[in-house]
């Protein structure tokens, strides 16, 4: 099983989620893919994702941006493998200025992001990681996040640092084989 966790204001309809799903379907493994709609509240997100992890023991995670932060929390809490795509590091700092009305990119759904949500994000921070669980993929051209924070945070993990690129990881398809190989490798 592979659980895809989308980023802030994104959705299961993201281009990367669709690519993973299509590849798994082409391999006859479509039933092994799940991409939940992550609630705006980090506490609710933790509940939803934690329950999903418990129902799918042995699953691997792919987390994009804020989804990478959640994937790190889940990977350490439930001893799961994870691929992190331009992951958010210290998102409670990055998103604090975003408090207020937000709109999801793919659905147009509006919600209010609050200071409580920022505090909930902080509560999910993982102090120590287990490097062997992770594959980090970052782009030096990420216009949203400083890739160096992730390189430092995930030191000791397998890393693919792509020169240039963008936050959405437009050339993600070029790395899908490495992503699936990491997810499918024995623990």
What spans do the regions from the language model cover?
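Active-site catalytic motif of lipid deacylating hydrolases and related acyltransferases
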Residues: 1-56
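Short hydrophobic segments within beta-strands
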Residues: 4-8, 62, 137-139
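Active-site phosphate/pyrophosphate- and oxyanion-stabilizing loops and adjacent acidic/basic residues
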Residues: 18, 22, 72, 148-151
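Short active-site oxyanion
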Residues: 57-60, 133-135
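Gly/Ala-rich beta-loop-alpha elbow adjacent to hydrolase catalytic centers
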Residues: 62-71
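Aromatic pocket-lining residues of Rossmann-like dinucleotide-binding sites
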Residues: 74-78
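The alpha/beta-hydrolase serine catalytic core
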Residues: 80-187
